[in-house]
Amino acid sequence: MVAERQGLSIAAIRLPWMSNWRLDGREDLSFLDRPTETAYELGTYLHVRDGATAFAAALLSPRPGFEAYNVMAPNALTNRPLADVLREAHPTYPKLPASWPALRCPYVDTKFRTHFGWAPQVDIVALHQQNALHPTMR
């Protein structure tokens, strides 16, 4: 409320784990090839370039008042769909609609995408599946 009364534009951006996914083999992504066994192995991520473009989008398109936002890649770091992991953990829970956003990512960043017209560009899981990463990162 103070931000709005004072005519300020404040965007509090919550970022997940960020990495630059160096292509020199220093990052170990071998966990993407094995089954996910616990919820702790699921993780949201964001490539550092996408983080930079998110901040730029917020700076270039200010909105009045204060808003908090989640910003992340559209999927979780696992080689299995989050819906499968949730179904195994809670087999009696009713089936969720395929369009439910949380099936793709543990956090939802729809508000940031809508307000600023932003979308992440780097999908590390897709790059891994296409063997587009450095061999020591597979």
Q: Whereabouts are the PLM-identified features?
A:
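Glycine/proline-rich active-site loop of Rossmann-fold NAD(P)-dependent oxidoreductases
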Residues: R5-S9, N20-T36, E41, R49, ...
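Proline-glycine-enriched beta-turn/loop adjacent to the NAD(P) cofactor-binding site
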Residues: P16-W21, P74
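Residue-level signal for the nucleotide or nucleotide-sugar donor/cofactor binding architecture
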Residues: G43-R49, Y107, V122
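Short, amphipathic alpha-helical "lid/cap" segments that border enzyme active or binding sites
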Residues: V48-A56, V125-H128
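Mid/C-terminal beta-alpha module of Rossmann-like enzyme folds, strongest
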Residues: A52-D109, M137
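Amphipathic terminal alpha-helices
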Residues: L103, D109, V122-R138
